[in-house]
A protein has these predicted regions:
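Short, hydrophobic secondary-structure boundary micro-motifs
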Residues: 31-32, 128, 164-168, 211-212
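Hydrophobic, amphipathic alpha-helical faces that serve as interaction scaffolds
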Residues: 107-123, 147-188, 221-226
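C-terminal all-alpha effector/ligand-binding and dimerization domain
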Residues: 135-136, 169-233
């Protein structure tokens, strides 16, 4: 079951939900075409203007290609979609491939070390102020999830590169879902607490090794996630 199907939805939002679900579950696979507008509106149970509005919105996100006088074609969203799809896909976690989270963590592992280096160089005192809270953070999965996100988005801001902030903002919905699972592991909380304190000490000493510390921890988090999913099998 996806993460939003039990919520009451407005007509346009309901249409979007039905269409996205139908793409992800293979009813309308990439490369296929949608039924005609009249037929599709009847199948979903909405008016044609409502359907048309939703189709254009989803087309703008990369799900469809709409050509006047031709059937609406379903795109390969992995190839045509943008970063904004991350927040949408987080609501349909049951449809994500098994290796999707690993790919996401690998992207973070590439981005975060240089971001941390810039943040430590630009705003060391502000970063220390956040990291100092790690000394008293409660041993709770949701609290760790919120703290870890606050640290990451703050580092993106302190990098003084607004593009990093935009990228990480698109990670938020996905991160909230995954972090709650990840930090259920005691080893993950213990590893992250050690990471925060190691970062704190390093920045206090000048921050020259911060990129190496973050890189090692990001790679370890991938291994921990693999262990978590392996135990679920």
């Amino acid at each position: 079951m996806d993460n939003i199907s039990d919520l009451p939805l407005r007509p346009a939002r309901f249409v979007e939900h039905r269409l996205i679900t139908s793409i992800l579950d293979g009813t309308y696979p990439p490369g296929s075409v949608l039924p005609g507008e009249r037929t599709l509106a009847g199948l979903i149970g909405v008016t044609r203007p409502t359907l048309r509005e939703s189709l254009h919105r989803l087309a703008g996100q990369g799900w469809f290609t709409i050509c006047q006088g031709k059937p609406t074609k379903i795109n390969s969203f992995w190839e045509n979609g943008g970063m904004g799809l991350l927040s949408i896909l987080s609501k349909y976690s049951d449809f994500l491939p098994d290796d999707f989270v690993i790919h996401l963590l690998e992207v973070r592992s590439t981005l975060l070390p240089p971001i941390a280096r810039l943040a430590a160089a630009n705003e060391p005192e502000a970063l220390l102020g956040i990291l100092e809270q790690a000394k008293i953070i409660e041993d709770d999965a949701m609290i760790f999830t919120r703290f870890d996100w606050e640290l990451q988005i703050s580092m993106a801001r302190y990098s003084h590169n607004p593009v990093y902030v935009l990228i990480f903002n698109d990670f938020l919905s996905m991160y909230e879902m995954l972090g709650a699972l990840y930090f259920q592991m005691e080893e993950a909380r213990r590893s992250s607490r050690s990471f925060y304190l190691e970062m704190y000490k390093n920045i206090r000493s000048g921050g020259k090794g911060i990129e190496r510390i973050v890189d090692a921890t990001m790679k370890k988090s991938i291994d921990l996630w693999k262990n978590l999913k392996g135990n679920d099998l």
